[in-house]
Amino acid sequence: MSENHDAIVTDAKTEEAGGCPVAHGRAPHPTQGGGNRQWWPERLNLKILAKNPAVANPLGDGFDYAEAFGSLDLPAVKRDIAEVLTTSQDWWPADFGHYGPLMIRMAWHSAGTYRISDGRGGAGAGQQRFAPLNSWPDNGNLDKARRLLWPVKKKYGQSLSWADLLILTGNVALEQMGFETFGFAGGRADVWEAEEDVYWGPETTWLDDRRYSGDRELENPLGAVQMGLIYVNPEGPNGNPDPIAAARDIRETFGRMAMNDEETVALIAGGHTFGKTHGAGPADHVGDDPEAASMEEQGLGWRNSFGTGKGGDAITSGLEVTWTSTPTRWSNGFFKNLFEFEYELEQSPAGANQWVAKDAPEIVPDAHDPSKKHRPKMLTTDLSLRYDPIYEPISRRFYENPEEFADAFARAWYKLTHRDMGPKSLYLGPEVPEETLLWQDPLPEADGEPVDAEDVATLKTKLLESGLSVSQLVSTAWASASTFRGSDKRGGANGARIRLEPQRGWEVNEPDELAQVLRVLEGIQQEFNSGTKKVSLADLIVLGGTAAVEKAAKEAGFQVQVPFTAGRVDATEEHTDAESFEALEPVADGFRNYLGKGNRLPAEYLLLDRANLLTLSAPEMTVLVGGLRVLGANYQKSPLGAFTRTPGSLTNDFFVNLLDLGVTWKSTSEDQTTFEGRDAATGEVKWAGSRADLVFGSNSELRALAEVYASDDAKEKFVHDFVDAWVKVMNLDRFDLV
């Protein structure tokens, strides 16, 4: 516990015996956290399915950020930001008289938490303002950068989100220092609470690294080497100043952010063209991070007792390195100094490992004393760009071709800062580049006259008469649409990339079965498209699921019309980055009762994680699982969770039979992943289930939802709720409908 909590809080929590109240057996008040999670730390956290609720948004349901952003005079905003950058404040003086390098670091660290494996992190919601990111060691003193920007945020209010402002400021900083950026897109709407659904690692101590196993194998989905770092330790692995070993960490962590070797070199060299690091004194002079700091600090942290605590006495990383002789101007100086000098190891004033140019002139300016000069210095991770056999030729080519380097950095910076925004159609503002890039998962424009209601009815009939079963149609539509990730707005049914590699070969999609279904659907498409109108395979896949759900509802005794909106298009192989899409392959899909190999978490947690990526609520997750089970959507037609005698009929049987008091459940596997339900009276085996099934009876909150759908009066409600949740998933990537 922090030693700097306010006295009034400390008094309220501390027992007469003194010390930490938790250590002395006292549970925290609900306002302090804890609660049920303290008693049962491994219980499912369903709150991640109710994040950013409307009641927490002070702007109200009617606020349209895209419209508000569109009202901005963006050049005027940029002029105001530029004025901040060049107006040094006594309370936090600007290095070299310019806040540009600080703001580049702020923007980079806002975006740099993105990881491609689950799409989480990134700049899209301005999470750098909240814990834990606001207090990560690697984000030291970025609280000051954001505070410097408050006058700009205050002036433009809700028309400019913090999330957009952080990235825009990074761009303005680059432009003010002579660099031509690739472009900027707004559209990052703020949220109002810290993310609780991101796994940042197993460690409970800053800068610990329990995330490795075997031959330095980094745990998935993590994208940094230590808790509280954005990427790598700049001193080298665990502080070991070995540039070759550091290069391995760089390649791993930047790769997990979807950056290749050229982009990695460009980003590191481009970013380190500007500014300096800060390590004027020992780390024990630095106080608590912003989240732990006392109330009078008003959200600022890392108060420094060394000297003046700022300017030339600042302490952030503990390293004291300035890379170039022009730290506030774009140049090729980083590569010049990297290749033209030899470096020897030294320790910073804080005791950190860094490198200084041997026998070099003092050509680097001091950040705050114009009478001083210094020799060029480098980080261990900078030297990786010279000594790693893959990075070195890239670095040398960039050194010899400055224009190529500038273009590579501009593009890599744009990718870094826009990677989690979703398709280009969501980009806002006058500075959005015309060029569409492969990492944006581009889709073609719709071709031909769209289908109408009569066409849809005709196609439904053809689909249901095609010989494909309800199970096949539902499973294919689900497989296509459920790739969507709300974290970075990738995936989904639009584009029909399920017919392309790598998706058509994913184990969870049962490639042989999928190929059979796609052949039938493509035949229907070709026949229809021989006329004057066109239907995309993407639309046809979803329509097949739609027709199947309607048929299944009718079998259950309910006539429903499942909403369907045409307009999807088919992506091309040329515009599909297969390697990038490999990250979307599910390691588990509890909705299909699929559990891949090597998962660390039990199936019920993975189901919850999948539901979270699909932006589902707990009721939506519940009703979808119950419906998909009776519709036969299980992986390889597994009997697990198929608690019905009428498969293909959209009944609430899953819930009725799961909650049947006449059934007792026993594990059938040593790892307790599968179970059988026996008739309590006869001992006859009635059902088989997985953890992703039985959790709806064992977890008290999910059981409460299951009871709703198992009730005698819930049959029709179940059908309508399933349809609503189904349509939501089918349309998750239909940003054109919002």
From Swiss-Prot:
Residues the record marks as site: Transition state stabilizer: R105
Pfam families: peroxidase (PF00141)
EC number: 1.11.1.21
UniProt keyword annotations, A-Z: Heme, Hydrogen peroxide, Iron, Metal-binding, Oxidoreductase, Peroxidase
GO biological process: cellular response to hydrogen peroxide; hydrogen peroxide catabolic process
GO terms for cellular component: cytosol
Active site, renumbered: H109 (proton acceptor)
Binding residues annotated for heme b, in chain numbering: H272
Signal sequence bounds: none
Biased composition (Basic and acidic residues): 1-16
Post-translational modifications reported in the UniProt record: Formation of the three residue Trp-Tyr-Met cross-link is important for the catalase, but not the peroxidase activity of the enzyme.
Keyword Heme included in the entry's annotation: yes
Cofactor: heme b
Disordered, as annotated region: 1-37
Gene3D superfamilies per the UniProt record, alphabetical: 1.10.520.10, Peroxidase, domain 2 (1.10.420.10)
InterPro entries named among the record's database cross-references: Catalase_peroxidase, Haem_peroxidase, Haem_peroxidase_sf, Peroxidases_AS, Peroxidases_heam-ligand_BS
HAMAP family: Catal_peroxid
Biological role: Bifunctional enzyme with both catalase and broad-spectrum peroxidase activity.
Designated name of the protein: Catalase-peroxidase
Lineage: Bacteria, Bacillati, Actinomycetota, Actinomycetes, Kitasatosporales
